[in-house]
Swiss-Prot record:
Enzyme class: lyase
The name this protein goes by in its record: 4-hydroxy-tetrahydrodipicolinate synthase
SMART domains linked: DHDPS
This enzyme's EC code(s): 4.3.3.7
Pathway assigned to this chain's UniProt record: Amino-acid biosynthesis; L-lysine biosynthesis via DAP pathway; (S)-tetrahydrodipicolinate from L-aspartate: step 3/4
Annotated InterPro entries: Aldolase_TIM (IPR013785), DapA (IPR005263), DapA-like (IPR002220), Schiff_base-form_aldolases_AS (IPR020625), Schiff_base-form_aldolases_CS (IPR020624)
Any Gene Ontology biological process: lysine biosynthetic process via diaminopimelate
Alphabetical list of CDD domains matching this protein: DHDPS
Subcellular location: Cytoplasm
Subunit structure: Homotetramer; dimer of dimers.
Length: 293
């Protein structure tokens, strides 16, 4: 069962721009020690668009090795090319991932029927559980609850969604079309409280890269019904949720992690490091959360 605080892992790079495997192994180990309940490598936060296919596969392999069964690994395996997505999912299955995260095809804007056919092809090609990643702001298309419901009913291995629509009511709508056992995970940290209140069971989080223990405690509080603690942690984390997204992409999270000494503040072009004004706001949010002095 995928539940709680799953981290959308950053991919550390050396100053030369190469994948920093040593830092990544240590980072995954730290995440597990801090209470993270699931690991999601090579998604958007892992800078998958700028990884080669060989690098993509290597990051997945390393993550699975380090996890060693201690937490589920949900391997990013999305593409706007159906055949390519199938290949990535099949590799994830061969490597020993526990599930695959498959994003809705971006840029080429398929219809709802096209979305159905894309995910149907992926589902037929693997036995891995598949989590649909619905993120309209980046993909420019939105999988409707009815389409998701058809997929969930037609394919037993389409088991859940990472929902980054920003519409918390979708949880209820998707429960009606997909069934009460369909796994619904928030794709937005700031609204995860409301998402879980509607029946969600966790979050694939960016902030948990930086504050894994707090995010894990927050998810546990929401899912156990401890509203007092959940609100306390929400207020503690909200400035950080907002600050690390003041600039697009993973730039904010990598800056914050560099402050903690976990990774180098290195991104691959076209992403760039945050502006000084943004860095100051992230610093303030980290202090508010109690992560730095």
């Amino acid at each position: 069962m995928l539940r709680g605080s799953l981290t959308a892992l950053v991919t550390p790079f050396e100053k030369s721009g190469r994948f920093d495997e040593k830092a990544f192994r240590a980072f995954v180990e730290w995440q597990l020690g801090e209470g993270t309940t699931g690991l999601v490598p090579v998604g958007t936060t892992g800078e998958s668009p700028t990884l080669s296919h060989d690098e993509h596969r290597h990051v997945v392999k390393v993550c699975i090795e380090v996890a060693n069964g201690r937490a589920p690994v949900v391997a990013g395996a999305g593409s706007n090319n159906t055949a390519e997505a199938v290949g990535l999912v099949q590799y994830a299955e061969k490597a020993g991932a526990d599930a695959a995260l498959v994003v809705t095809p971006y840029y080429n804007k398929p219809t709802q029927r096209g979305l159905y056919e894309h995910f149907a092809a992926v589902a037929r090609a693997t036995k891995l559980p598949i989590i649909i990643y619905n993120i309209p702001p980046r993909s420019v298309i939105d999988m409707m609850p009815e389409t998701m419901g058809r997929l969930a009913h037609d394919f037993k291995n389409i088991v859940g969604v990472k929902d980054a629509t920003g519409k918390v009511e979708r949880v209820s709508e998707q429960r009606m079309t997909c069934g009460k056992d369909f796994i619904q995970l928030s794709g937005e940290d700031a609204s995860a409280l409301g998402f879980n209140a509607h029946g969600g069971v966790g979050c694939i989080s960016v902030t948990s890269n930086v504050a894994p223990r707090l995010c894990a405690e927050f998810q546990e509080a929401t899912l156990s019904g401890d509203s007092v603690k959940a609100l306390e942690l929400q207020d503690r984390l909200l400035p950080l949720h907002k600050a690390i997204f003041l600039e697009p992409g993973v730039s904010g999270a990598k800056y914050a992690l560099s402050k903690l000494g976990k990774v180098e503040n290195v991104l691959r072009s076209p992403l760039v490091t945050v502006e000084e004004s943004t860095a100051a706001k992230i610093d303030a949010a980290m202090k508010h959360a109690g992560l730095i002095n």
